[in-house]
Each structure stands twice: as C-alpha cells, then as structure tokens.
C-alpha cells in the first residue's frame, strides 16, 4: 500500500519540483527558522500534555532553550524584527497558558497510518486528541500562524484535520465533534464543527492530488521570491531557484 502524508500532498501545489526533490529523489533538505520555531513550541506543549513539564515550567524552558532550538535567523522584514516578534509571541503565550481544564487527553503527537483509498494510505500525527467535558472528541492542531487571512485559507488548512478524523472514526467508532486550531501566537482557538461533507471534500482533494502526482512527468518549479529565498528546503541547492534553469 502506497502511503502519503498531508504535508506531502500539499507541498505538491507549493512547488512540484521541490516535491520531486524531497519525495522522489529524496535529496536532503535544510531547515528554516519558521519550521524550527513551530517545532520548538510543539515540543514544549507535547512535554506538558505528556506530564513531562508543569505549567509553571513552560516559559522558563522556552527561554532557556530557544537559542539552541531555533538557531537560524528569521527573514528580514521592513516593518518588524520577525525573530523578536516570534520570540515575544511564544513567550507571552506560554506565560499565560492555563492548560485545558476539564478535557481528557486521549493522545499527544499521535502517529497513525490508515487506508484512505484502494491501495493508498494516509500517514500523520495528531498534535492533541481530546475528550471535552461533554464527552465529545476534539482534534487540536498547534499552529504558529497568527491568523487565517480568509475563509478559503482556513478551509484549506482544515482539510488536514478532517482527513485525520478518519483515524478517530476507525479507532473510536465515532467522528470528532470539532477540529480546533490553537493559533498560539495570537492566543486564540479557531474552532470548526466536523461535518461529513467537509470530510468528503478533503477526501476528494486528496484523491485528485494523488492522481495528479502519479500522472506527473514534468516536475516544474513554481518559483516565488519569499519561498525560494527563505522557506524551501532546497533554497541553497535548487537548480531552478526563482526560475533559473541553470
């Protein structure tokens, strides 16, 4: 059975050539400050929900380990110091975070692989699987993104968690009540009710994306200045960076 991840499927639309380098050539990538920052806050929340850190320890752990965990510079910005802004946002969140009283933790960084179509499976990690005080199941995803810029953008991000609901149904025999984005830099929870219609849309998208990937013979680059210069894992080695075919 061939296995895909949501991030892999999504990356095909960001840049097919980067997808090719990562998933087909399996070329080694370099990291970026945004990824390292997000992973670090994920790590802290994982430690808290697994009982490895107490609430009062979170901010101190963040301050003590930030430079070690996020050694790369953030991109330059004409209006703000992104590195300082991200640091301050993360610290403010962890200093004010009060936990999730009344919620039962069902899983933390829960890894799974489930079949989605004939011959295909989805591999993923659920950041936090919860049971709320009413007994309903909630899928929570921690996001360093401060906010969604549009309804369409929010729906695109939500596809991932709707697909992850397949694991919940397989494991618990029922669908989650809602999916939640913990946009921790803004200290807000973005809640979306689960519907089978939204799940079907996500499945259709996944199927169409897999079909597009498997029928692709020309792995074209989709160069953009910010992505190519600061985000792409192949920004120092790509032969087609920002449209250059040399």
Please give the residue ranges for each predicted region.
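RecB-family 4Fe-4S metal-dependent nuclease core
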Residues: 1-246
């Amino acid at each position: 059975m061939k296995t895909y991840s949501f991030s892999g499927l999504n990356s095909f639309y960001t840049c097919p050539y980067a997808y090719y380098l990562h998933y087909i050539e399996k070329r080694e990538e370099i990291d970026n400050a945004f990824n390292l920052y997000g992973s670090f806050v994920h790590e802290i929340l994982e430690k808290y929900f697994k009982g490895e850190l107490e609430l009062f320890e979170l901010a101190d752990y963040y301050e003590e380990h930030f430079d070690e965990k996020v050694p790369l510079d953030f991109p330059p910005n004409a209006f703000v110091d992104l590195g300082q802004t991200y640091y301050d946002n993360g610290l403010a969140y962890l200093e004010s975070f009060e936990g999730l009283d009344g919620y039962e933790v069902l899983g933390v960084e829960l890894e799974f692989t489930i079949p989605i179509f004939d011959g295909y499976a989805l591999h993923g990690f659920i950041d936090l699987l919860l049971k709320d005080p009413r007994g309903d199941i909630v899928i929570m995803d921690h996001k360093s993104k401060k906010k969604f810029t549009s309804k369409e953008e929010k729906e695109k991000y939500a596809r991932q968690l709707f697909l992850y609901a397949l694991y919940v149904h397989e494991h618990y025999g029922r669908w989650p009540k809602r999916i939640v984005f913990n946009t921790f830099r803004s200290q807000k929870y973005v809640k979306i009710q689960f519907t089978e219609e939204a799940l079907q849309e996500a499945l259709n998208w996944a199927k169409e994306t897999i079909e597009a990937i498997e029928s692709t013979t020309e792995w074209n680059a989709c160069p953009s200045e910010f992505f190519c210069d600061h985000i792409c894992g192949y920004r120092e080695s790509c032969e087609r960076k920002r449209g250059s075919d040399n």
